[in-house]
Every structure is written in C-alpha cells, then in structure tokens.
C-alpha cells in the first residue's frame, strides 16, 4: 500500500487488535538482518518500543490536535518491557591506555577532546559546538539538549590538555573562527570526525571499538564520578540530564558541588600531557 492511497477512513478502520498483530509481527516475524543467508527474526524490545511510540504520537495528533478521530486505539497499549543492562564504560586502566595511545598530527587536539569527554562527560554534539569563548579557567560552558546552558567543571589535568592545544588552535583560521576544535579542512570539527578520532584512539589502545564509543566515554565519566563518591543528583547536573533515570527528577546543584564533582572524578588525575611536550605536530 502506498501512503498516497491511505485516507482517513483507512486509519479509522484500524483497531487495537490490528496494532497487537503488528507488534506481534515485530516481535516474532520481522527479519533483523534480511540480507543475511541465515536471517534472525524478532526485533528488540527497545526497537518495538520506539515504533509503538511513533504510532502513539500519530494517533494522539489525530485525536487531540486535528480531531479527525474520536477514539485512540493505542492509548492504553503498554510498551514492551525493556531489558535493563548496565552501560558499558572504561576502567581506569583502559582510560589511561586510551589517553596514552593518542598520537599523530592532531595529537594535542585529540588528547584535549578525550580529556573533555572523560572529565566532563559531555555529549559529542556538545563538544563540537564548543567555542573558544566557552572555555573558562576551571570550567566550560555547554549548550545541551533543549538549548539549555550549564557549566561543567574540569580538573587540572584537563586544563593542561586544553592549554597544550590552544596555541595550535590559535594559529589556525577556521571558517567558523569561534570554534574550539577545528578539522583538517579548517571547518568546525564534525560529530563524524569526533567519532572517527575516538575509534582510532580506541584501536590504538587495543580496545574494542565496536563496544566503546564517544558516548561510552560519557558513561565512563559518570561511573567514575559515582565511584568517587559523588552524589547521583550532582552527576545528573554534570551530565545535563533532566532525569538521570526514569524516576529521578532534575535537581539543581550549587556550583561549588559541581567543582567538587570534577575533582572527585578519578579520571581528572590522569595526566600524560608530558609525552607531548617534545611533539610539535601541527593540526590539519
């Protein structure tokens, strides 16, 4: 059926049993890897939940916004139960290996980026949007989801990494000269480029780049802060989460506690910047 052939009457004729049938198909008969010689069937609960969420949003729009439907057949449908799993993160030893592995023409830039991920737990999108003016003596200004501003403190080792990188950055003229991190073509660094440099560093450190990513470095920062005794609500503020988990309500933490959180993160003590002192490789 083509979308252009679907009219409002077709949608009105769909009832809850049809949605149940679709969800059953997803759980049991939908091919996960259809191009494989031996495809597996049944997509994950998380994938089914995302599809049901889209359907719920569609019917809510038709019933509450456009008033084209009087009844919502999916209003009372429950989401699939999701398997709870602990997020993957690097150990202290793996984090040290990752930082020690950084090399190449962009060594100082890449080292500073990894230090910011491990110390501040920021998102990739937040990192690529950092400007020179967002860097303060002991913290960075971050614009997170929903265009919300927060300040995240970092430790002395992270400060040294940024200071080692800034002279190289200041020699470059970027198309967006506000950008803290630039690329080899003199543009603001992209999310894709950050993904590649993290993957490269993971491989050089002998770590599985299919299991770890920039987002896993965010998990690492959060885990290490918690293991260092930081209150979960403080970590929530550092990460810029409205909810640290599904039941946690966002709580504002005073800046002094955020600074303590930065120093309590064991990763803030890792410092391998001396290995770059004799390396004058230039950014590209």
Residue ranges and their predicted role:
Residues 1-284:
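Conserved catalytic core of the tyrosine transesterase superfamily
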């Amino acid at each position: 059926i083509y979308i252009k052939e679907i009219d409002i009457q077709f949608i009105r004729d769909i009832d809850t049993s049809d949605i149940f049938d679709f969800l059953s198909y997803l759980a049991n008969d939908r091919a996960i890897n259809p191009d494989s010689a031996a495809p597996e069937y049944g997509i994950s609960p998380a994938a089914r939940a995302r599809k049901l969420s889209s359907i719920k949003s569609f019917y809510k729009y038709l019933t509450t916004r456009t008033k084209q439907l009087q009844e919502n057949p999916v209003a009372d449908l429950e989401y699939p139960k999701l398997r709870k799993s602990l997020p993957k993160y690097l150990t202290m030893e793996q984090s040290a290996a990752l930082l020690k592995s950084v090399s190449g023409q962009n060594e100082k830039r890449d080292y500073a980026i990894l230090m910011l991920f491990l110390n501040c737990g920021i998102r990739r999108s937040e990192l690529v949007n950092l400007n020179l003016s967002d860097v303060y003596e002991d913290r960075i200004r971050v614009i997170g989801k929903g265009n919300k501003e927060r300040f995240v403190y970092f430790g002395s080792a992270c400060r040294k990494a940024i200071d080692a990188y800034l002279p190289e950055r200041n020699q470059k003229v970027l198309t967006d000269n506000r950008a803290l991190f630039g690329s080899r073509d003199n543009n603001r660094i992209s999310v894709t480029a950050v993904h590649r440099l993290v993957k490269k560093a993971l491989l050089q450190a002998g770590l599985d780049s299919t299991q770890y990513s920039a987002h896993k470095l965010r998990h690492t920062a959060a885990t290490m802060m918690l293991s260092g005794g930081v209150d979960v609500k403080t970590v929530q503020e550092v990460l810029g989460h409205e909810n640290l988990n599904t039941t946690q309500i966002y709580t504002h933490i005073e800046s002094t506690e955020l600074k303590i959180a930065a120093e309590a993160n064991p990763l803030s003590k890792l410092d391998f910047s001396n290995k770059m002192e004799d390396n004058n490789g230039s950014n590209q």
